[in-house]
């Protein structure tokens, strides 16, 4: 007892870093949801640095490149998606691709679309902020991917 190996220290540091990053992502998520719900925009100050970081991460984790499909789909669709949605799709797509591959990215895209469509139908609205749906779907799919990998 009392032995503390380098492996133990590394595991504790990794757990602490993971907890910090998860908390930071949660705070970022709340900020984006509130901003998009109130103002119908996702500001560059909250989306661009994270999107650029996600692209840089792809150089170190090549599985992330497939996540750019989400942003590409929004660029191709054009109408209905703002620049903030595209930048957010870069970040969320890369993270989901790293966590769960192309299946996670597609699940995130489909779930976000379903959430926004449901909001439009229930509210009988013609427009809706899409960022909250994207973020909710990314959290759900991210947790599901993590859980499924542990099983």
Q: Where would I find each of the regions flagged by the language model?
A:
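A membrane-topology feature that recognizes alpha-helical transmembrane segments
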Residues: 1-151
